[in-house]
């Protein structure tokens, strides 16, 4: 039961948000360097809000992405990976999928805008989206630069965690074959480091914290290799309703954990 009167909710959340920020500052705890987010629950948000057109939920969720990235940047986080479209999502209704891909393309172009000064990389198989969306996404990402960027963004589109590992192994073996490796040398080349160096996220730190909205408590194939020792944080909030208060709670919970990395 909601005990806070509607007219007092916004002021109450602002006070709570301020308190969380002060807690993080006072704790002097180490914040995550890299946050990964599964932006889930757009369709359910739209249906619960009474909309028949689920693309309204996608649009609402898209508007939240740049906002959340600015929260990360303001907190001093160096990198964020956002999961926007899985390979499984490509099986959705064609009309819904067309609208979703257009929305994703628009939001990536927004993220890549010069005024953000962010370095952006896509992870996934853009060819699965069709020629025009793939072209627009490549052009947008290529317009960003790592030079002078103090915040880096990965956008997971047409991404599958299992496929990424398969692609990494294939890439590793192809390079070894090109160098004339024997069968025995190929077997020896398949190592943890060798696979890591051929992932879509090669050269980047693994995520310290993985956030998933919508109440679902699973990775759904997201960064399977990279998230081996990531901390997980789940919230019931649908992505369009995800607030800065929720984000700060995730950071607070992260700083209270002791990361053992399997030791």
From Swiss-Prot:
The record marks 84 as: Important for determining product length. Disulfide bonds: none annotated. It holds the Pfam family Prenyltransf. The lineage of its organism: Bacteria, Bacillati, Actinomycetota, Actinomycetes, Mycobacteriales. GO terms for molecular function: ditrans,polycis-polyprenyl diphosphate synthase [(2E,6E)-farnesyl diphosphate specific] activity; magnesium ion binding; Z-farnesyl diphosphate synthase activity. Mg(2+) binds at residues 40, 231. The active site is at 40, 89 (proton acceptor). Its cofactor is Mg(2+). Catalyzes the condensation of only one isopentenyl pyrophosphate (IPP) unit in the cis configuration to E-geranyl diphosphate (E-GPP) generating the 15 carbon product (2Z,6E)-farnesyl diphosphate (Z-FPP or EZ-FPP). Z-FPP is the precursor of decaprenyl diphosphate, which has a central role in the biosynthesis of the mycobacterial cell wall. It is found in: Cell membrane. Keywords: Cell membrane, Magnesium, Membrane, Metal-binding, Transferase. Homodimer. Its main location: membrane. This is (2Z,6E)-farnesyl diphosphate synthase. Its EC number is 2.5.1.68. One of its GO terms (cellular component) is plasma membrane. It comes from Mycolicibacterium smegmatis (strain ATCC 700084 / mc(2)155). It catalyses: isopentenyl diphosphate + (2E)-geranyl diphosphate = (2Z,6E)-farnesyl diphosphate + diphosphate. SUPFAM superfamilies: Undecaprenyl diphosphate synthase (SSF64005). It is an enzyme of class 2 (transferase). Substrate binds at residues 41-45, 86-88, 92, 212, 218-220.
């Amino acid at each position: 039961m909601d005990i806070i009167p509607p007219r007092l909710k916004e002021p109450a959340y602002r006070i709570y948000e301020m308190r969380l920020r002060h807690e993080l500052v006072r704790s002097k705890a180490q914040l995550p360097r890299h946050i990964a987010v599964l932006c889930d629950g757009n369709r359910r948000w739209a249906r619960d809000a009474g909309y028949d057109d689920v693309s309204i939920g996608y649009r609402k969720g898209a508007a939240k992405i740049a906002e959340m990235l600015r929260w990360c940047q303001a907190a001093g986080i160096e990198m964020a990976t956002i999961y926007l479209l899985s390979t499984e999502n490509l099986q959705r209704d064609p009309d819904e999928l067309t609208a979703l891909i257009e929305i994703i393309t628009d939001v990536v172009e927004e993220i890549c805008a010069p005024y953000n000064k962010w370095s952006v990389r896509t992870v996934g198989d853009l060819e699965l989206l069709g020629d025009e969306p793939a072209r627009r996404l490549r052009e947008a990402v290529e317009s960003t630069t790592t030079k002078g960027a103090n915040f880096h963004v990965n956008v997971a589109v047409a991404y599958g965690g299992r496929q990424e590992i398969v692609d990494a192994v294939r890439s590793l073996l192809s390079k070894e074959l090109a160098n004339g490796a024997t069968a025995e040398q190929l077997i020896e080349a398949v190592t943890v480091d060798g696979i890591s160096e051929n992932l879509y996220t090669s050269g980047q730190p693994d995520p310290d914290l993985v956030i998933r909205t919508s109440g679902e408590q699973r990775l759904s194939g997201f960064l399977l290799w990279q998230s081996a020792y990531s901390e997980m944080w789940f919230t019931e909030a649908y992505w369009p309703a995800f607030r800065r208060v929720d984000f700060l709670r995730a950071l607070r919970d992260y700083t209270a954990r002791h990361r053992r990395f399997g030791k």
